[in-house]
Amino acid sequence: MGHGKLKKFSENETFACLLQPASGEVLDRQAGEFWSPLNLKDHPMKGHWNEKMFHGRNCPIVLELGCGKGEYTTSLAERNPDVNYIGVDIKGARLWKGAKYATETGLPNVAFLRTRI
């Protein structure tokens, strides 16, 4: 792995704004089945994004599918503080950039979800 991916994966686990599977959850799955909170019928986030991820900010939620590094997601969140944004991508190394920026700048209305679409 190049470009510091292992360091980024490790740091991803510290970002409160990033929801992703723990490494054990991925490894416990059968071959071909990828962990996804969207596949879990009774996932604790279901119906509770504003309450749990956005700390009670009862605002509309906008999803950006395939958000990559999250530049567009974080930019929209900065421009529209009365909207909650969730960037979705499968690549943890990409999500690291957006999650790190959101954490460092204290953006309360942005979150990232690592999963397949």
Model-inferred region functions:
Residues 68:
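Conserved glycine-rich SAM-binding loop
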Residues 65, 88:
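Conserved beta-strand/loop positions that form the S-adenosyl-L-methionine
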